[in-house]
Amino acid sequence: MEKYLIVGLGNPGSNYAKTRHNVGFMVINEICNKLNLSLDSSKFNGIFTKTIYNNSIVFFCQPTTYMNLSGEFVIKMLNFYNIPIKNLIVIYDDVDTKLGTIKLRKKGSSGGQNGIKNIINILKTDEIKRIRIGIDKDPHIKLDQYVLSNFKIDELVIIKPAIIKGALATLAAIGEDFDKVMNKFN
């Protein structure tokens, strides 16, 4: 059976739980709720669950380091469980994408997002499948303050369907051709 590492990016702790920067965690939580799983294992500064999905062994994970150190967790999980980079999918927030829009890519730069930037640097490749959840940006608020702020009530109505769609796209990508999944969800 093929193995997959699905990593949602965010910052640990209840004070960050509802922030824009934590939509990757929110997607992992949505998947766990949908599949009746819990993140009940911990290793390498991260929490995860292991399950069988679509004839594949899948690890759904949340690093418990801060966002900009996510790569350490990712490389340790890939190496320890012998998971190929081609079966890594990273889910994270994107300030350059409209709120509530999801975008799937097979490779590319970090776009300034520090979590994926750290993963790219540590893995020494930008050929990493990713699901970006649009959180927009506010020109009146400094970027670091904006991404660490909670969604406003009117934004939750927009972001919740994107989190669900991100979860569905993630599940669709397991054991499937990523190009087909991109065509369906982009």
UniProtKB/Swiss-Prot annotation:
<dbReference type="InterPro" id="IPR018171">
    <property type="entry name" value="Pept_tRNA_hydro_CS"/>
</dbReference>
<feature type="binding site">
    <location>
        <position position="114"/>
    </location>
    <ligand>
        <name>tRNA</name>
    </ligand>
</feature>
<feature type="binding site">
    <location>
        <position position="66"/>
    </location>
    <ligand>
        <name>tRNA</name>
    </ligand>
</feature>
<keyword id="KW-0820">tRNA-binding</keyword>
<feature type="site" description="Stabilizes the basic form of H active site to accept a proton">
    <location>
        <position position="93"/>
    </location>
</feature>
<dbReference type="Pfam" id="PF01195">
    <property type="entry name" value="Pept_tRNA_hydro"/>
</dbReference>
<dbReference type="InterPro" id="IPR036416">
    <property type="entry name" value="Pept_tRNA_hydro_sf"/>
</dbReference>
<protein>
    <recommendedName>
        <fullName>Peptidyl-tRNA hydrolase</fullName>
        <ecNumber>3.1.1.29</ecNumber>
    </recommendedName>
</protein>
<keyword id="KW-0378">Hydrolase</keyword>
<dbReference type="GO" id="GO:0000049">
    <property type="term" value="F:tRNA binding"/>
</dbReference>
<keyword id="KW-0963">Cytoplasm</keyword>
<dbReference type="GO" id="GO:0072344">
    <property type="term" value="P:rescue of stalled ribosome"/>
</dbReference>
<dbReference type="GO" id="GO:0006515">
    <property type="term" value="P:protein quality control for misfolded or incompletely synthesized proteins"/>
</dbReference>
<feature type="active site" description="Proton acceptor">
    <location>
        <position position="21"/>
    </location>
</feature>
<feature type="site" description="Discriminates between blocked and unblocked aminoacyl-tRNA">
    <location>
        <position position="11"/>
    </location>
</feature>
<comment type="function">
    <text>Catalyzes the release of premature peptidyl moieties from peptidyl-tRNA molecules trapped in stalled 50S ribosomal subunits, and thus maintains levels of free tRNAs and 50S ribosomes.</text>
</comment>
<keyword id="KW-0694">RNA-binding</keyword>
<dbReference type="GO" id="GO:0005737">
    <property type="term" value="C:cytoplasm"/>
</dbReference>
<comment type="subunit">
    <text>Monomer.</text>
</comment>
<comment type="similarity">
    <text>Belongs to the PTH family.</text>
</comment>
<feature type="binding site">
    <location>
        <position position="68"/>
    </location>
    <ligand>
        <name>tRNA</name>
    </ligand>
</feature>
<feature type="binding site">
    <location>
        <position position="16"/>
    </location>
    <ligand>
        <name>tRNA</name>
    </ligand>
</feature>
<comment type="function">
    <text>Hydrolyzes ribosome-free peptidyl-tRNAs (with 1 or more amino acids incorporated), which drop off the ribosome during protein synthesis, or as a result of ribosome stalling.</text>
</comment>
<dbReference type="GO" id="GO:0004045">
    <property type="term" value="F:peptidyl-tRNA hydrolase activity"/>
</dbReference>
<dbReference type="InterPro" id="IPR001328">
    <property type="entry name" value="Pept_tRNA_hydro"/>
</dbReference>
